[in-house]
């Protein structure tokens, strides 16, 4: 396999921690997703994973960027509807302005990120922030891997759905339901806000809670459940299936769907 370093200044790897193992997803030089799972009771598990990469890339070495995600309820977010499209630097400045205005916390104590979407009329900017201290506590579970990017789990789930659906489904007014063991997540993007609800019940109960809490029409429902969590679905719900670890896939897709590339943070 030919390998060009200029195309891999950094290899981005989505990582997701389960109780007893790590899931990894990355995209090879043909933009095909690759996955790997390793159990934490293997004392050499980090070296084993790095050896797997080294073998795949014929001994070539290059910087790795690990992307993880954190549950949305541990973060603060706000959606802005702006009249004009912003470039990356303007998005960054707008984030800082909004955070300093809305949160009684020094900017230096926070990590923040954004998602930007051009609309037919205007521009949607979703700002997310988390206390560095909270993030660092959460990231201890990922040791010995050094996490370079920490996103929000709901963003990762959305990205994975869109990737698997070939980006042919509009997110707005579409409900995405995700279940991994006893963790259930419902996401619907409206023009003015992202509606997110999580629970530890089942998807039917979560759907009922979601429709009671949030207003707005739902045009379609897509569902992903890990195979061990499969349950019968209503006829009008559409199941999405993949052999790839779902959240690790969404993490690996970080920034691939951004209108602007992120600046700092």
Swiss-Prot record:
The UniProt keyword set, sorted, is: Competence
Q: Which GO terms describe its biological process?
A: establishment of competence for transformation
**Tree of life domain:** Bacteria
Q: What is this protein called?
A: Competence protein A
Purpose: Involved in transformation (genetic competence for DNA uptake).
């Amino acid at each position: 396999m030919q390998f060009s370093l200029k195309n891999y200044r950094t290899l981005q790897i989505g990582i997701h921690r389960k109780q007893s193992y790590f899931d990894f997803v990355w995209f090879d030089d043909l933009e095909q997703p690759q996955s790997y799972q390793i159990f934490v009771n293997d004392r050499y598990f980090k070296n084993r994973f790095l050896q797997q990469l080294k073998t795949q890339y014929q001994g070539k070495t290059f910087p790795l960027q690990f992307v993880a995600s954190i549950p949305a309820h541990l973060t603060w977010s706000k959606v802005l509807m702006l009249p004009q499209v912003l470039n990356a630097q303007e998005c960054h400045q707008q984030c800082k302005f909004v955070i300093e205005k809305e949160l009684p916390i020094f900017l230096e104590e926070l990590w923040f990120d954004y998602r930007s979407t051009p609309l037919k009329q205007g521009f949607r900017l979703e700002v997310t922030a988390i206390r560095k201290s909270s993030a660092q506590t959460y990231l201890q579970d990922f040791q010995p891997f050094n996490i370079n990017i920490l996103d929000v789990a709901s963003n990762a789930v959305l990205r994975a759905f869109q990737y698997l659906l070939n980006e042919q489904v509009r997110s707005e007014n579409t409900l995405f339901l995700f279940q991994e063991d006893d963790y259930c997540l419902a996401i619907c993007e409206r023009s003015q806000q992202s509606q997110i609800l999580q629970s530890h019940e089942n998807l039917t109960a979560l759907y009922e809670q979601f429709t009671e809490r949030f207003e707005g029409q739902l045009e379609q429902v897509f569902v992903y459940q890990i195979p061990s969590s499969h349950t019968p679905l209503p006829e009008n719900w559409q199941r999405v299936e993949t052999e790839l670890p779902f959240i690790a896939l969404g993490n690996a897709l970080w920034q691939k769907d951004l209108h602007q590339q992120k600046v700092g943070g």
